[in-house]
């Protein structure tokens, strides 16, 4: 099982994660077997806002958008899909949530990769499964649990 990751940088932000980090985090979240391919595109707020408005009807930038690839009938390609991650939103959320930038970036890559593999968080039961898996994967990489509150971090 291998994952081929195409990294596209379309952001002016400084201090972006390295390609090696992005690939490591994407590989950590791969649940499917066989050879797979994914594109991770790092963008600024305007591109994220445009895509979020076009595909989700929300006229604001968002942290990560996932675009799963659907094989046409009779054709099997190894494509998982595309992730579009908005650098300024991820950096701002990390500060707001009192996380390191690396921890939040890892979480967003894992979150998006799970969406590409069919995980979702709209229904409570599905959200519990997805969030539990995200927590397991993020902590396996040495980061704190992504959904811990600031008070629970202070307590222990």
From Swiss-Prot:
Which EC class does it fall in?
hydrolase
Q: Name one GO molecular function term.
A: RNA endonuclease activity
Query: Known PROSITE patterns for this protein?
Result: UPF0054
Keyword list, A-Z: Cytoplasm, Endonuclease, Hydrolase, Metal-binding, Nuclease, Ribosome biogenesis, rRNA processing, Zinc
Q: What EC number is given for this enzyme? A: 3.1.-.-
Q: Which residues bind Zn(2+)?
A: 111, 115, 121
| Any single biological process term in GO | rRNA processing
Query: What's the record's note on cofactor binding?
Result: Binds 1 zinc ion.
Report the cofactors: Zn(2+)
Keyword rRNA processing in the entry? The reply is: yes
Task: Kindly give the InterPro entries that the UniProt entry links to this protein.
Answer: MetalPrtase_cat_dom_sf_prd (IPR023091), YbeY (IPR002036), YbeY_CS (IPR020549)
Q: Can you list the disulfide-bonded cysteine pairs?
A: none
Where located? Cytoplasm
Q: What Gene3D superfamilies does the annotation carry?
A: Metalloproteases ('zincins'), catalytic domain (3.40.390.30)
Its GO CC terms are:
cytoplasm
What superkingdom does the record give? Bacteria
Write out the function statement from the record: Single strand-specific metallo-endoribonuclease involved in late-stage 70S ribosome quality control and in maturation of the 3' terminus of the 16S rRNA.
Q: Which family does it belong to?
A: Belongs to the endoribonuclease YbeY family.
Protein name (database record) = Endoribonuclease YbeY
Q: Which gene encodes it?
A: ybeY
